């Protein structure tokens, strides 16, 4: 199915908010053991790279590969059937007794994980691959995805991640370079 999907907010100096970062984190953390000794950093790095590189998938199957679509997300090729298929899916869920899942809890590496990602980013900055402002944005994204002030010994809830998302989003909205990027996008693109 033809589709273009991605979290491209970093291009204008922001990060995906309103659950965008949280959703990507949840999708890459799916299936991870609930074990304080488990290192979640490789999964977090997958989410980080998708968001940080503003990857855009072309097509539904690539969307699954990138974690933009979940394995159980349905695809409707015919736009005329979209409403019908959605209605049938919802009715089927209701008949099956669907209940909203409990909010996820995460064991995240906190500042230790963010430091590892920042080390990688520092190399990209020194190599001229990203600007200082992009380093700042990506560093703040790493703080969100690694859980801020926490460690794998502690479980944090979705609201904790959402609070970090909001805090970082608002901080970036106040950055002059972000405002310039947004203005450029609105006037030139």
Regions found by a protein language model. Name each.
Residues 1-39, 45:
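CoA-thioester-processing core
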Residues 8, 16, 60, 72-73:
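Extended hydrophobic-aromatic, low-complexity segments
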Residues 26, 30-55, 59, 71-73, ...:
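Intrinsically disordered, low-complexity segments enriched in small/flexible residues
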């Amino acid at each position: 199915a033809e589709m273009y999907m991605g979290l491209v907010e970093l291009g204008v100096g922001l990060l995906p908010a309103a659950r965008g970062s949280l959703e990507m984190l949840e999708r890459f953390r799916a299936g991870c053991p609930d074990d304080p000794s488990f290192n979640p950093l490789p999964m977090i790095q997958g989410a980080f790279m998708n968001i940080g590189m503003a990857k855009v998938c072309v097509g539904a199957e690539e969307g699954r590969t990138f974690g933009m679509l979940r394995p159980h997300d349905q695809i409707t090729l015919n736009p005329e059937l979209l409403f019908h298929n959605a209605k049938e899916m919802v009715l089927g869920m209701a008949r099956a007794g669907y209940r909203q899942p409990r909010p996820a809890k995460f064991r995240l590496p906190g500042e230790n994980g963010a430091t590892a990602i920042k080390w990688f980013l520092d190399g990209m900055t020194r190599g001229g691959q990203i600007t200082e402002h992009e380093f700042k944005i990506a560093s703040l994204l790493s703080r969100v995805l690694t859980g801020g002030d926490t460690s794998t010994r502690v479980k944090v809830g979705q609201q904790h991640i959402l609070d970090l998302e909001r805090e970082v989003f608002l901080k970036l909205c106040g950055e002059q370079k972000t405002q310039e990027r947004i203005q450029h996008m609105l006037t030139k693109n």
